[in-house]
A protein has these predicted regions:
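Elongated, amphipathic alpha-helical interaction scaffolds
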Residues: 1-221
Length: 222
C-alpha cells in the first residue's frame, strides 16, 4: 500500500513539474520571438487527435515569405513544430522520432490532400542542456548533426528540417527568455531577465510572470 502511494506521489510530482515548465516554455517562446510576433501565430498544446496527443507548441508564419529576425527562426518554413523538454526530462532518440511522427500527423490533419506540403514543416527540439547522446545516436543512424551557431544544431537527412536547441549555450543578450528556463538560474541571469522584463508591456509582463513562476517553483523545491 505504501509503495503504491509513493508511486502515485512520484507520478503526481512529475505531472506537476511538467505543468509548470511547459506553459513557461510557451510563454518564453513568445517573448523570444517578440520582434517577429506580427508575422507569427502561436498555438500551445496543438491537438492532433481527439485523444490526448499534443504538440507542445506550433508557430505558423502569417506571411509565408516573411523573414524572421531571431536566429532560431532562420530554419522556419510556414509551419513550425516545437517539442520542449524541461531540465529534468531527457531529450532522447524516442523524443526525436515522436516529433517526426507528430509532424507527419500535422501534415495529414487538414481536410484536403497535401493542404500542408511536407516542405513547409520544420521541427525544433529544445532543452537547456545539449543532448549529446541523442546526437551521437542520430549520427550512428546516418543523420548529420551540424552546429549552425552557438546553441543551435541542424540535423540533416530527416524528411523535415530539424534543429536542436541547447538553451544554456545560447547567447544571453539575444536569448535571455529561453536561457531563463533552467533549474540552475544564476543571479546575474535573473537580474538581466528582470531588467528585460521591466521594459515590457503589461501583456508581455504577464507572459514573463509564467516563466518566473516556473523558475521560482523549481528553485523552492530544490
Amino acid at each position: 500500500m505504501e509503495k503504491e502511494q509513493t508511486k502515485n506521489q512520484q507520478e503526481n510530482q512529475k505531472k506537476s513539474q511538467k505543468l509548470q515548465w511547459h506553459p513557461a516554455f510557451c510563454s518564453a517562446l513568445r517573448l523570444e520571438l517578440l520582434e517577429d510576433a506580427a508575422n507569427l501565430e502561436f498555438t500551445d498544446e496543438f491537438q492532433l487527435t481527439e485523444k490526448p496527443l499534443q504538440i507542445d507548441c506550433t508557430v505558423v508564419k502569417v506571411k509565408k515569405n516573411c523573414r524572421i529576425k531571431n536566429e532560431i527562426g532562420k530554419i522556419f518554413r510556414k509551419h513550425n513544430i516545437f517539442e520542449y523538454k524541461s531540465p529534468k526530462d531527457e531529450l532522447n532518440i524516442d523524443t526525436f522520432y515522436k516529433a517526426v511522427a507528430y509532424a507527419c500527423l500535422y501534415k495529414v490533419l487538414p481536410n484536403h490532400v497535401d493542404e500542408i506540403p511536407a516542405e513547409e514543416i520544420t521541427i525544433t527540439l529544445i532543452r537547456d542542456r545539449k543532448p549529446v547522446k541523442l546526437m551521437q545516436e542520430l549520427e550512428k543512424s546516418g543523420y548529420e548533426c551540424k552546429k549552425e551557431t552557438v546553441g543551435i544544431y541542424y540535423v540533416s537527412g530527416v524528411m523535415f528540417p530539424v534543429q536542436i536547441i541547447a538553451s544554456s549555450e545560447l547567447d544571453v543578450d539575444m536569448h535571455v527568455q529561453l536561457k531563463a528556463l533552467t533549474n540552475h538560474l544564476e543571479e546575474s541571469l535573473m537580474r538581466q531577465y528582470l531588467l528585460r522584463v521591466s521594459a515590457f508591456s503589461e501583456r508581455e509582463k504577464n507572459l514573463a510572470d509564467v516563466v518566473l513562476q516556473a523558475v521560482s517553483y523549481t528553485h523552492l523545491r530544490a
